[in-house]
Regions:
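Enzymes that bind and transform nitrogen-containing heteroaromatic metabolites
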Residues: 1-161
Length: 161
């Protein structure tokens, strides 16, 4: 049985999701949207993403993909591969969200059951990109537009059967 999971990401118009270990913008309300969607779920991330966050995300089970596990803590597990992380996440009765970074998105996007994508209405320099994907493989089910300190739009896609 295939594990059902969603990718969630914020990117600039030019697909940048990071610069070094930082997000190259602050869009008021965007992180609250991320929190609302992922709270209560299981989040899967690469080591660099975990290091940039600096701690496990609260109110979520955190799974970090790394070749060098650091030991487990409450609501925090380490796995050596994407496949192992998805297997572990499937045993936890919660929605599963892949939250980055670029390499992890690239390895999981083709089998995602849903995408939660926020596009910040700016072009920025960076070194971590959200991968291109076949939009015809997904149905767009929701779009929301926001204007705070920056304009951004949220799109929710589900995979076609």
């Amino acid at each position: 049985m295939k594990t059902s999971y969603a990718l969630i990401a914020a990117m600039s118009r030019n697909r940048i999701i990071g610069r070094g270990d930082d997000i190259p913008w602050v869009a008021k309300g965007e992180q609250a949207l991320f929190k609302k969607i992922t709270s209560g779920g299981t989040v899967i991330m690469g080591r660099k993403t975990f290091d940039s966050i600096g701690r496990p995300l609260p109110k979520r089970h955190n799974i970090v993909i790394t070749r060098q596990p650091r030991g487990d803590a409450d609501q925090l597990d380490f796995c050596g591969s994407v496949e192992a992380a998805l297997e572990l996440a499937a045993t936890i009765a919660r929605p599963i969200f892949v939250i980055g970074g670029g390499e992890i998105y690239a390895r999981t996007i083709d089998h995602a059951s849903a995408l939660h994508l926020t596009t910040i209405d700016i072009d920025v320099e960076g070194d971590v990109y959200f991968p291109t994907f076949d939009e015809t493989a997904f149905n767009l089910v929701d779009t929301q537009h926001f204007e705070t300190n920056l304009k951004y739009s949220y799109r929710h896609y589900t995979a076609k059967s």
